[in-house]
Amino acid sequence: MSNKKMLTVLLVSLLAIRLGAQDSIPSFVKDSLDVYTNRALQQWQLPGAAVCIIKNGRVVLMKGYGLKEMNGTDKVDENTLFMIGSNSKAFTATALAMLDNEKKLSLDDKVTKWIPEFKLDNTAAGEQAIIRDLLCHRLGFQTFQGDFTYWTSNLSRREVIEKMSHIKAMYPFRTNWGYTNAAFLTAGEIIPKVTGMQWEDFIKEKIFVPLGMNNTLALSKDYPAANNKCEPHTIYNGKLVKIPYCQIDNLAPAGSISSSVNDMSKWVMMQLNNGKLDGKQIIPSQAIAQTRRPHSILGDGGHIFNKGHFALYGLGWFLEEYSGRKIVSHTGGVNGFVTSVTLVPEENLGIIVFTNTDQNSFYEALKWEILDAYLGNPYRNYSQVYLGFASSQNNSEAKKDKALQDSVALHPATSLPLAAYTGHYFNNLYGDMNVVMENSELRMKFSHHPNMYAKLEALGGNRFYVSFSDPIFSKAVFPFKVENGKVTGVTVKVADFVEYNPYEFVKK
């Protein structure tokens, strides 16, 4: 054989070996993922999940696990809809980056150029804020600050934007990262100012349709009518319960999209191919790059098994280093669902995990398990590790809750007659709340959540054990303030899943 022929054979052999290595499926994915997932469904009281893995432009795995609804019979498949929550944010950021690329706006435009009524409590910050500030969470708010006021409320989008001016920012402008859903709403509301199209119409026409995401819904109001969909669930009093659909179209650009892993695989393939799908440029590569440019510093990227070196936020994406690779990802959580979408551009790898409870860490555990499998890291059994954390926390909370219920059962005396706590209360951000006697119970009724109430049971003195009619808002202890024998106010705190900050209501 001539040297030239031998060299050709050698090159072809090396190429075949390289391609085979590129397309090889890790043993965890090939042999263990199904067992791992089905076991996790039981351990996490998780009715159903859907998973998709994309490698080198091809779908390696795409399937559903478990059931759409607890105690049901319909199985999750690759076309079953889940509400994807804050994974909607990357769509909003991408839409605005597209408009920036088309020179129809600049991401450095001041927000007030497009929404003159936009204001913040810090007047100068409101005047100086640019579109990028909205998309990278650097307005100065604490994470989730203000969300109780907005979340599943009857406020309009315009009213949500107006309410932002009443929030006392926790940090100076642009000094700290704080996850702000209302900021993404504001960014999304710039789109109709520029294009004449509502946010939901723009992303459908410019993103969903070109990608062939024909099963994807932009608004939560359309979810209940979908045929192939999951029901929302949570864990309440240690048990799995079905909960109402989440209506958050007043925050739509921050989190109202519903999709399937099949549809989302097209979004992920396009992202991994710098805006192209099936050879066609759907999103300009410059717009994709804009969203992955670091804007906010979160920390050093610490991980339970792997010390990271940075954790940042782009525009609608978290950016971090893991095992020497740049990870582009986001998670999403709305009532009854938690989801994750992960890109590893250097490995041409994409991972999608959707689940239909909002009280599980499996959606993140499986992501890390798949990442480790493809990156050659040892198997960690993240689900078991996270279960340990969750079990410890749940046991602690259950003990505290039982102690509170035991106290209620003793019928301790309140400092004042129950009628003294009734009346009209006001918070400058939230607005109006009333405490009333109804069905022989003391209840709180919130003006912007007319379908929800909080039941108050005496713990003695001026403290009350509170349980919300909507399990998402959880349970708490509310202390009333009393001066000179009169009730002057109350501190209201909902579940951290909704907001970390307490609200001080003053009695009128």
What function would you assign to each model-found segment?
Residues M1-S24:
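Bacterial Sec-dependent N-terminal signal peptides
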Residues N3-K4, I17, S88, C136, ...:
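Residue-level micro-sites within transmembrane alpha helices that shape
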Residues S13, I53-K55, Y65-L67, S88:
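Short glycine-rich, polar/acidic loop-and-turn segments at beta strand-coil junctions
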Residues Q22-K63, P192-E205, V209, I235, ...:
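Catalytic loop of the DD-peptidase/beta-lactamase superfamily, centered on the K-T-G motif
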